[in-house]
């Protein structure tokens, strides 16, 4: 049920459930603080991350067509956004991974140009960063795989119904490493990364592949099939 308050332009949504109900109000309170503001049961959380998973919603817009033919980054963002809603701890782990990755890339850039620290010191620091990157990356990839096990059968069944079985859809997680293998991969490519001056492996370089009759949809899917 949606209600519109024309005077205050404040839509409200109410979804009944047993034995209680949840009401969400979107608008501009009279005493709102400057900038972004959110509250749950009248109490504002100390951090925005605490709201993850509080307001699950399914939104479709034309930009979502890029999930099929766009860059892998968009598909990774799709996965990570869904997982932040499902698992409250995912966002914190993801942020830690990104922070360590940024530190690693900064170190690798300096290594490639010969700036700052001695080479041996850079190698030691790189090993420390890779250890943390592997720990966070393994946990995040596991969550991604678990989510796809739930999503793929439903998505493929829905597509089969829409296409009347004209073609078969499948979803595959294109991983750079098997579960438990990220630490070894980082060690194997450490020298290559030092020469390249950038990170070359990790979950930030993986992809979600959508296939139609075992062919990549990003190459062969029509506009209608993408929708």
PLM regions: where:
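Conserved NTPase motor "head" modules and their coupling/switch loops across ABC/AAA+ ATPases, GTPases
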Residues: 10-14, 115-227
């Amino acid at each position: 049920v949606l209600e519109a308050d024309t005077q205050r332009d404040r839509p409200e949504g109410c979804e009944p459930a047993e034995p209680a109900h949840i009401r969400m109000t979107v608008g501009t309170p009279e005493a709102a603080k400057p900038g972004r503001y959110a509250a749950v049961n009248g109490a504002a959380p100390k951090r925005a991350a605490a709201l993850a998973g509080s307001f699950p919603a399914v939104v479709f817009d034309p930009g979502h067509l890029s999930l099929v033919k766009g860059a892998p980054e968009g598909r990774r963002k799709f996965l990570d956004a869904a997982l932040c809603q499902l698992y409250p701890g995912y966002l914190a782990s993801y942020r830690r991974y990104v922070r360590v990755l940024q530190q690693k890339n900064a170190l690798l850039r300096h290594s490639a140009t010969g700036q700052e620290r001695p080479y041996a010191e850079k190698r030691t620091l790189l090993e420390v960063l890779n250890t943390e990157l592997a720990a966070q990356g393994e946990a995040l990839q596991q969550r991604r795989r678990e989510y796809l096990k739930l999503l793929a059968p439903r998505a493929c069944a829905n597509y089969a119904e829409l296409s009347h079985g004209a073609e078969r859809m499948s979803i595959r997680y294109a991983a750079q490493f098997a579960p438990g293998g990220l630490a070894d991969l980082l060690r194997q490519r450490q020298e290559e990364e030092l020469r390249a001056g950038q990170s070359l492996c990790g979950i930030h370089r993986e992809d979600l592949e959508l296939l139609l009759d075992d062919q990549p949809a990003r190459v062969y899917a029509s506009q209608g099939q993408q929708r």
